[in-house]
């Protein structure tokens, strides 16, 4: 993903005003947000607003998160270049494309087949070759590639799904919105051997995480 994409000035303003301007400091996260073309992950006519700080529809009753939240959750995950990362809720693939620039391998799970197919196409279009898109119930995680140095959940769960904590590597981090259907808190869970430390960051509003260990459909 080294080719400069159109609308680079809009991305730079997005980063300066909406992301760095709101306290995101990790230079790798800022660089990834400035480089990945968000408009390619949003269908028309909504792509015209791709660099506004707002969630937008991507079809199938799903949304793409606002840029600030993508940057915040990525910074909280703190992926390193050698890391293996699991994302739950691929959506259109934008968050995975950001993670692909920051980690060695990204596995992203999407419940809806049509959405997963679009994510694959979008990720291929931006050359994110280190991302694998899996169709299935993300609340089970993906044991075949576990353990993960980082797990990022992009839908709201009533509680942290147990399979995800089990697939987290020692010293790994899990970032997930936890709460009711209307409002949640971003929770960061860190593993230290058999112990886990949990921190609540700030209030958010995400679509529900549907699955065995999430919400019923």
UniProtKB/Swiss-Prot annotation:
It holds the Pfam family PCMT. InterPro entries: PCMT, SAM-dependent_MTases_sf. Keywords: Cytoplasm, Methyltransferase, S-adenosyl-L-methionine, Transferase. It comes from the Archaea. Transmembrane segments: none annotated. GO terms for molecular function: protein-L-isoaspartate (D-aspartate) O-methyltransferase activity. Its EC number is 2.1.1.77. Gene3D superfamilies: Vaccinia Virus protein VP39. It catalyses: [protein]-L-isoaspartate + S-adenosyl-L-methionine = [protein]-L-isoaspartate alpha-methyl ester + S-adenosyl-L-homocysteine. PANTHER family: PROTEIN-L-ISOASPARTATE O-METHYLTRANSFERASE, PROTEIN-L-ISOASPARTATE(D-ASPARTATE) O-METHYLTRANSFERASE. HAMAP family: PIMT. Catalyzes the methyl esterification of L-isoaspartyl residues in peptides and proteins that result from spontaneous decomposition of normal L-aspartyl and L-asparaginyl residues. It plays a role in the repair and/or degradation of damaged proteins. Belongs to the methyltransferase superfamily. L-isoaspartyl/D-aspartyl protein methyltransferase family. This is Protein-L-isoaspartate O-methyltransferase. The lineage of its organism: Archaea, Methanobacteriati, Methanobacteriota, Stenosarchaea group, Methanomicrobia.
